């Protein structure tokens, strides 16, 4: 396999230069972090599962007209994506009280919110990704008013679609994180959905039992992280019973010439 130049390495993914201008290869790692990387670990096979799950959701979002950076999955751990300029804002969509919302406002975990809440966080690990308002985003030029309108509109569309998708397989979509990027076409840019959608960035609870099937199992030392991610993939029809999607991280990276 041709050795590709590494562009960037984050907590959960690595970006390599793509085969064509304007493309990148997104590689999913098994590394797990929580609390702004204060807690670190490994979930064996997480990258394989997240690659499949994110591919599935991004592909389905594309069919309803949500523009994304996803082009196609290349192998078990990699997908080809459009190169974008990431907007430095994490968008969190909340349907049910959980996580930091319960701590900030003293709301009991699991409380159904009267309406969906969209929150914005400035992407800066050193600052702990602080929560910001629209006024901060406009003041510091992180995104234009038109871009924020498009981002909010896409976030609601993604939420509506995913709530139905997961409800259909017996899963409650509690909240999730989205990232967006500017896709440039000559001098014109538009905002499209980027990063990934997987159990790493979603809170997913079994509707019948309330069992957590996401990265909270790692955050809260509940154990069974691999089984939870596999259960999401299985219910989405991506992992037939008996199929083993786990792939050793180091051997795969050696094979690709890293």
From Swiss-Prot:
Pathway: Purine metabolism; IMP biosynthesis via de novo pathway; 5-amino-1-(5-phospho-D-ribosyl)imidazole-4-carboxamide from 5-amino-1-(5-phospho-D-ribosyl)imidazole-4-carboxylate: step 1/2. GO terms for biological process: 'de novo' IMP biosynthetic process; cobalamin biosynthetic process. The keyword Ribonucleoprotein does not apply. PROSITE patterns: SAICAR_SYNTHETASE_1, SAICAR_SYNTHETASE_2. One of its GO terms (molecular function) is phosphoribosylaminoimidazolesuccinocarboxamide synthase activity. It catalyses: 5-amino-1-(5-phospho-D-ribosyl)imidazole-4-carboxylate + L-aspartate + ATP = (2S)-2-[5-amino-1-(5-phospho-beta-D-ribosyl)imidazole-4-carboxamido]succinate + ADP + phosphate + 2 H(+). Signal peptide: none annotated. Pfam families: SAICAR_synt. Disulfide bonds: none annotated. Keywords: ATP-binding, Ligase, Nucleotide-binding, Purine biosynthesis. GO terms for cellular component: cytosol. Its EC number is 6.3.2.6. It is an enzyme of class 6 (ligase). Belongs to the SAICAR synthetase family. PANTHER family: MULTIFUNCTIONAL PROTEIN ADE2 (PTHR43599), SI:DKEY-6E2.2 (PTHR43599:SF3). HAMAP family: SAICAR_synth (MF_00137). This is Phosphoribosylaminoimidazole-succinocarboxamide synthase. It comes from Rhizorhabdus wittichii (strain DSM 6014 / CCUG 31198 / JCM 15750 / NBRC 105917 / EY 4224 / RW1).
